[in-house]
């Protein structure tokens, strides 16, 4: 039986849930939807992208340790460039500028406060 497969929701390990929530909200434009330091987990979103932020105590039984790498697939080279410009104007920790890679991805990388990485990309192999 075929099922419509939903988007994955990555768990991002952080050391300070309140500081991480503020960074994702203020610098990267996410919304903190629920949770926080008291729960050890928070749900954040931006458009159709959803993620969980979790602190050390919450992760203790599960073994998810930083840093992690998350790929964010956008719909065009222009969207990648626009998001880079937006995040460059904030205090986002830009690791690399947008670049067309030999493997046919136009991408840049940003880090959070804990060194987790986000590679923002567009696959231009079919353009």
Q: Where do the language-model regions lie?
A:
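N-terminal beta-strand motif that seeds the catalytic metal site of vicinal oxygen chelate
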Residues: 1-21, 68-72, 123-127
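C-terminal "cap" of GNAT-fold acetyltransferases
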Residues: 2-7, 15, 38-51, 109
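Short beta-strand-to-loop elements that line the ligand-binding cleft
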Residues: 10-12, 33-35, 99-100
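Vicinal oxygen chelate
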Residues: 15-18, 70-117
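Conserved acetyl-CoA-binding loop of GNAT-fold acetyltransferases
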Residues: 26-33, 89-92
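Conserved short beta-strand elements that form part of the metal-binding/catalytic scaffold
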Residues: 31-66, 117-122
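A short acidic/small-residue loop/turn micro-motif
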Residues: 40, 102-103, 124-127
């Amino acid at each position: 039986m075929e099922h419509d497969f939903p988007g994955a929701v990555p768990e991002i390990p952080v050391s300070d849930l309140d500081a991480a929530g503020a960074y994702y909200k203020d610098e990267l434009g996410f919304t903190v939807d629920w949770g926080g330091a008291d729960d050890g987990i928070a749900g954040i979103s931006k458009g159709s992208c959803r993620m969980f932020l979790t602190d050390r105590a919450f992760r203790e039984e599960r073994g998810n340790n930083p840093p992690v790498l998350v790929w964010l697939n956008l719909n065009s080279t222009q969207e990648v460039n626009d998001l880079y410009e937006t995040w460059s104007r904030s205090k986002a920790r830009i690791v690399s500028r947008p670049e067309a890679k030999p493997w046919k991805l136009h991408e840049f990388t940003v880090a959070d406060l804990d060194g987790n990485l986000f590679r923002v990309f567009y696959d231009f192999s079919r353009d």
